[in-house]
Amino acid sequence: MTQYTLKQASVLLQSKQISAVELASAYLAAIAEKNPALNGYITIDQDKTLAEARAADERIAQGNASALTGIPVAYKDIFCQTGWRSACASKMLDNFISPYTATVVQKLLDEGMVTLGRTNMDEFAMGSTNENSFYGAAKNPWNPEHVPGGSSGGSAAVVAARLAPAALGSDTGGSIRQPASHCGITGIKPTYGTVSRFGMVAYASSFDQAGPMAQTAEDCAILLNAMAGFDPKDSTSLEREKEDYTRDLNQPLKGLKIGLPKEYFGEGNSADVLTALQNTIDLLKAQGAELIEVSLPQTKLSIPAYYVLASAEASTNLSRYDGVRYGHRAAQFSDLEEMYGKTRAEGFGSEVKRRIMIGTYVLSHGYYDAYYLKAQKLRRLVADDFQTAFARCDLILAPTAPSAAPKIGADASPVETYLSDIYTIAVNLAGLPALTLPAGFSSGGLPIGVQLIGNYFSEAKILGAAHQIQLNSDWHGKRPE
């Protein structure tokens, strides 16, 4: 029962061939069996889950259900939900029970979706491997010696391991797409401002965006229909007419112009990644898509620009964790200043401290112009590159990551780890939508994904193209043993 896609489970629930309680119980049993080794979930509450499932069954019986009623979903530990621990995988919030619910979570609860639990992540969403979690690293379900990616590593792992049909992630510099690629599932980062950030713990406010993760592009489109929309509680939320993100699912690939950025196909990619890209290019050609070489010359500037800007925003956002109102507080201190210092030293992990220090430095007097303002200018150049490319093509095909998932504990420096986000970060700098979908496997049997990047508000076009690719391939149907 846990092998169904979201769409398949929806059909079975609506036709009353299975009940929401049966489906939730099957997932809870699978979680109890497999999660101790996987560590994809860090908070489970069977009683709450089954209560939501019973309520969903009542809605279905009364005939007022939506397509998502009764479907279980996992939430990255960055989303607040009343009565659930929302720790952001940090010691700082280990004892924080949220008094309110994130807008995007509330939207899915209103649809009748059933909460399975909170998934593991890099602390405060800072990381690319899930090794920065206070609760220990989640494992890659394809090979437990390897990372699932990050920061939404737990969400990617539980969907790939069939411990949830869908999950929510957040994407600040690639945190939905990179782990989805490493775990062999589909995930989309929408246009910045499409999905409300209210109740999603802030890392870098001008980058953060929530999105769905599932087995297929069709599942992601169904979820995005429920998630998107204006929210007056989020000042960055965009007021736009409601869209149907499933509208292009049946649009053929014939005539679609796909840009291939020459800077993304270079020596930095493993042979396995280049093979996966070539497989996708061959499929697109066979389906009648037109392939055009484009250039994104400022890509090389995206990593330094991103880590200056995101760290600056993080140092500001994380200043609220001071031990006064909520969260961890040091046990022993002699005055207020010592309490602040000890609380933050004990509560934050090393990567979070590193980014706070970088951010505080680049915002400090004498360095603001040299680093922060310069990075803002580079951000504009990166965004302009994409607009030049989209004048010639509808979508851009790119690698999601330069290689398959590395081993847990691989001796990479922070800079080497940051460089693994080279293909995802530019999209966040520009605020564009992008989706990753499975496109092959490495010689070691680990999944490899490719990215489809679109212009602003082209989610339906991206999801349609991805769905057509998935109709003509089976990478998304493969699952770990």
Swiss-Prot record:
- List the PROSITE patterns: AMIDASES (PS00571)
Q: Name one GO cellular component term.
A: glutamyl-tRNA(Gln) amidotransferase complex
DNA-binding listed as a keyword: no
* UniProt-recorded Gene Ontology molecular function terms: ATP binding; glutaminyl-tRNA synthase (glutamine-hydrolyzing) activity
Q: Which reactions are catalysed by this chain?
A: L-glutamyl-tRNA(Gln) + L-glutamine + ATP + H2O = L-glutaminyl-tRNA(Gln) + L-glutamate + ADP + phosphate + H(+)
Reply yes or no: does the keyword ATP-binding apply: yes
**Signal sequence coordinates:** none
Q: What does this gene product do?
A: Allows the formation of correctly charged Gln-tRNA(Gln) through the transamidation of misacylated Glu-tRNA(Gln) in organisms which lack glutaminyl-tRNA synthetase. The reaction takes place in the presence of glutamine and ATP through an activated gamma-phospho-Glu-tRNA(Gln).
Its quaternary organisation is:
Heterotrimer of A, B and C subunits.
Question: What is the name attached to this protein's record?
Answer: Glutamyl-tRNA(Gln) amidotransferase subunit A
Q: Which organism is it from?
A: Neisseria meningitidis serogroup A / serotype 4A (strain DSM 15465 / Z2491)
